[in-house]
Amino acid sequence: MNGYVFVTPCHGLTPCLLPPKQNALLFSEVACMQDELSARTEGKRLDTIPFAIGFLSVFAFIVSAIAFPEPFIRFMDLLQDKIVKDLGWASVFFSFLVMLFTFGIVCSPIGSIRIGGRDAKPDFSFFRWFAISLCSGIGIGILFWGIGEPIYHLMQPPQNLGIAPKSHEAALFAISQSAMHWSIAQYCIYAICGVAFALMAFNEHLPLSIISGLDLVMPRKHYSLAKNIVHAACLFSICCTVISSIGALIMMISSCVAYLTGLERSFAMNAIVALVATAFFVGSSTTGLKRGMNFLAAQNTRMFFIILFYIFLFGPTLFILNMGTEAFGYMLTNFIRNSTLVSTEFMSDRWADSWIIVYMGAFFAYGPPIGLYLARLGKGRTVRQFLLMNVFAPSMFVYLWINTFGSLAIYYQWKNLVDVWSFVQTQGLESTVIGILQRFPFSMALIVFFVIVTMISFVTLVDPMTSVLATISTKGISAEEEAPKFLKVLWGGNMGGVALAV
């Protein structure tokens, strides 16, 4: 056409014709972009510097904990107490800002941007997407704290609200606050990180990285230094956080196994549980997102709903419905106030330090790695769909779960059928959950089913973290590629072994 060039730009913009005089400049720019993209997406290989620093830092941290346990524990307690007291308000305040920011994006034109470009097609169905999103962030905590946390809030509500323990308002606060802790703020933090990584990876065609996009605004030498520091810090923080979670999860699962088998819980039992669990989550991670995690998350989600339906059907159904309806209204009425609860009037009251501040701090720590994992699921979806699926869908499930199990615990406590509060204080969460499930028909089958769900939930929590650690340790990896299997085995085996030792 007389030297004109027909061009279709990236990101779904309108095709256009360029005159001959701009041809040379156009092709020169395209060639530069291709060279730059090739440099960014060069073959996958170990990112040696951050990997070595992160791995050795974790090793030194764990050795210190084992060699000097008492000074180490004192130091960590002092550090945590200092952070909670001085910066707790910040974690609560900024989590609230993240929620507002998320709601704003959902309602703005930005929500119409399609991840991967206008013609991108999704890799997962809505159900599979929901299942992976739910299971990668929920872990097994809600299985036990769904009963435990509402009882704590029922018996020990925050002093600055003036709520009487065991009262009707305390029950409404217990259900609504527990649901808030496990839902909206958590998923907003994960989703905002995830959508940012997804746009960088699928729309800007950058490698999947915690600091994607900084290479566009920073000099190369500064970017390399920043990348190494940030990636090493992420590897260290993620690994240590997951190790502590794995240790707690092993103890919970061991308690359930001890009950089912009648055996006394011991180090040998913990070792067997750790070995089996590690083998499962490493195996799932090495098979990749579209196989292992895709399958396990779908089955786990179905099993979640089976348990919910069973408890709802054979439990105090009408009480659960009434409490859920009233608590939902209470949550909406007091959403802003209860999203920003900190101890002001009663400085001696450690309620906020023990609950909302700890939760928000943990969510910010888990935000980037879980967001990095969720980003891989977003191709072909709009930003609005991404946020709705990763925030509102799992939050609705969490409310159903917390209301069902929390209302059950409150009902038993009020009717003196089971002293749930005393059970939690003396026997622990695991025994409390089992004790409550014993009151249902076919209790042994229900408990076995619950333990299986607990194990799968454990796998679906640690699988994404293992994959993220391997991804951060790899150079030039895109959102549609899997990290090398040897890195997944190395990080997964290391975390499982160290968690058992600690």
Predicted ranges, named:
Residues 36-43, 69-83, 102-123, 173-181, ...:
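Membrane-water interface regions at transmembrane-helix termini and the short interhelical loops
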Residues 27, 32-168, 313:
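N-terminal alpha-helical transmembrane segments of multi-pass membrane transport
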Residues 57-72, 95-112, 245-255, 272, ...:
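Hydrophobic alpha-helical segments and their helix-loop junctions in multi-pass secondary transporters
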Residues 32-45, 209-223, 249-273, 302-307, ...:
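Helix-loop-helix connectors at the membrane interface of multi-pass transporters/channels
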Residues 34-41, 74-80, 107-126, 151-176, ...:
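Flexible loop linkers connecting adjacent transmembrane helices
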Residues 145-159, 199, 312-334, 395-427:
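Extracellular/periplasmic helix-exit of transmembrane alpha-helices
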Residues 43-58, 219-228, 263-282, 286, ...:
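Loop-to-transmembrane helix boundary motifs in multi-pass membrane proteins
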Residues 95-98, 127-149, 183-202, 235-246, ...:
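Hydrophobic, membrane-embedded alpha-helices of multi-pass small-molecule transporters
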